[in-house]
Amino acid sequence: MSQANASPTTTPLTRELIVQNKMGIHARPAAMIVRITNKFRAEVLVEKDEEQVNGKSIMGLMMLAAGKGAKVRFIATGADATALLTELEALFARKFDEV
C-alpha cells in the first residue's frame, strides 16, 4: 500500500523526544512510560541510536540506557497512536515529574 493511500491506523507516527531529567530513563521513568503506553491499543516501538525496543516493556526501555540529553524516537501504530504520543510528549516535558 502506498503512503498516500495508507490509513491512519496503519501508518506509523513518530515523535523524537529528548530526555531532560537528570537521571535519564531509569526504572521509575520507564514504568511511567509503560503505564502510558499500556493505556492504549497502539503498538509502540522506541529507538535510541541503532537499538529498538518494545515501548510497553520496562526492561526494554531501561536497556536503552537513555541518559540526560539522549534523543529517543517513539514509533506508534494504531487508531489511538496520536493520543499515545501526545501523552508521552507531556511526560517528557514534565521531566518525568522529577524535582
Predicted regions, residues:
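C-terminal binding/interaction regions
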Residues: 2-12, 71-73, 80-99
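Short amphipathic
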Residues: 10-21
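Preference for short coil/turn "hinge" residues that link or interrupt alpha-helices
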Residues: 16-18, 46, 52, 89
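Glycine-rich, flexible loop/turn motifs
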Residues: 19-21, 49, 60, 92-95
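Amphipathic, hydrophobic secondary-structure cores in small proteins
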Residues: 25-27, 31-82
